[in-house]
Amino acid sequence: MKLLDFEVGINHPFFLIAGPCVIESEALALETATYLKRVTEDLGINFIYKSSYDKANRTSTNSFRGLGVKEGLRILQKVKDEVGVPVLTDVHEDTPLSEVASVVDMMQTPAFLVRQTNFIQNVCKQGIPVNIKKGQFQAPWDIGNVVNKAYETGNRLITICERGTSFGYNTLISDMRGLSTMRSTGCPIVFDATHSVQQPGGNGLTSGGQREMVPVVARAAIGVGVSGFFMETHPNPNEAFSDGPNMVPIDKIDELLKTLQELDAVTKKHGFLEDSL
């Protein structure tokens, strides 16, 4: 599948969606986008910058939600213009979709809204690529129904994102078999390595996370075979306004991507025996 100006799929090197969880300021957005562009260009990785103007599903109303759609889109447009990278942001049921689609290159639907048929179809009707996050409560084989809803709009530029599965209270796990199962949809599969180690609501008024496990689950996913990675990153995750416990320090992402590139080449060189069994 051609996504923006590059090919994605299980037989192509992985692409990267990355950036801070939420847009904290114009300065941080430009700084992180510039850094990530340099790293990915040096490694030859196709890159889409991600950051949110509104986090609608925060644990507490005391948590920072974002700068709002107007200011958020202004900053994302500036990132596109000054840094020269494509941008992605997530949208919600009350989002002015056409306004967002006029700025961003790709939209993302939240995992909690994956079963909302009207929402999924309205997003896909905007005619730009959509990264659909699989619900934490959803079986891998059920995502095909969501893909069919998306395809009914005529939009075939759909990727599916695995972000972990609920496992008891405040815990997510990654069932790597699901990555293979979801490939049967024909959609490129993206693995969200940072939200997969989140501990939803685990800190009471905020979510916890195990950022030290990001490389672990990412290496496992690359062994199964994925088309892309989603990773949230920040210069100082402990000071981040949202999802700090599961974000990767930005100065560590280069090392992680190099490892994943090497493993990706080996996995895709030898093919996928499971497809013939």
Swiss-Prot record:
Q: Does the keyword Cytoplasm apply?
A: yes
Pathway note = Carbohydrate biosynthesis; 3-deoxy-D-manno-octulosonate biosynthesis; 3-deoxy-D-manno-octulosonate from D-ribulose 5-phosphate: step 2/3; Bacterial outer membrane biogenesis; lipopolysaccharide biosynthesis
Can you cite a GO biological process for this protein? Answer: keto-3-deoxy-D-manno-octulosonic acid biosynthetic process
Its EC top class is transferase
Keyword annotations for this protein, in alphabetical order, are: Cytoplasm, Lipopolysaccharide biosynthesis, Transferase
Subcellular localization(s) per the UniProt record: Cytoplasm
State a single Gene Ontology molecular function.
3-deoxy-8-phosphooctulonate synthase activity
Do you know which Pfam families this protein is assigned to?
A: DAHP_synth_1
UniProt signal peptide = none
Q: What is its main location?
A: cytoplasm
User: Which EC number(s) does UniProt give?
Assistant: 2.5.1.55
Recorded catalytic activity of this chain's protein: D-arabinose 5-phosphate + phosphoenolpyruvate + H2O = 3-deoxy-alpha-D-manno-2-octulosonate-8-phosphate + phosphate
What are the record's GO terms for cellular component? cytoplasm
Q: What's the family?
A: Belongs to the KdsA family.
Q: What name has this protein been given in UniProt?
A: 2-dehydro-3-deoxyphosphooctonate aldolase
| GN (gene name) | kdsA
